[in-house]
Amino acid sequence: MKTYKEKMLILLVEKYRKSKKDSGTNVICRRTSISPVELYKKYNKNDGDLEEIEAVNQAAEACSRDGFLTFENNGFSSEIAKIYLVDEKVEEIEAYLESACGYESKSRKRQYVEQMIARYSGISPAADRECERLKGILVQNKIPNSYLQTEEVLKALTFIEKNETPLYVREASMMIYGSSKYLEENTLESVCNLL
């Protein structure tokens, strides 16, 4: 189970990676922030568990000592109002999360997509079109939403375009994925749209 420290850092990094700051198209310079309520729903409530609230506070203080984030308190209390990411430390935070809880960083996802493009480009026309679409997304410094699903689709596209013998859908699914219903249940619609 992830600790509040890991949850806090993951929320901040994911928010940063989805922002325009990461892609370089931002116009307004705004800090990446979360509220403690995103970590523990009853943080600001009177019936909130004090141990949980204190655990969130200690996690924020530990991350602040590591230089990963800063936070603001409400007035003179120990209650945290906002938690802010230190943008310059994003790669360092991702490396920490990767070792601590197996988090997959953006650079690792990007590397995986680039390898997938290299593996499937040039095999079939439909796969080439999909690889070009993926390259366009990578140029914008973004990661395709369902890149793992896209690899399954590319695998099916290349098989179907190379195949010359008539097959039933389940036979093709067995030859591609090793499961008779995987193609039918998961990737058939996407494959048909691309063909």
What is each model feature region?
Residues 1-195:
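Nucleic-acid enzyme cleavage-core boundary/entry regions
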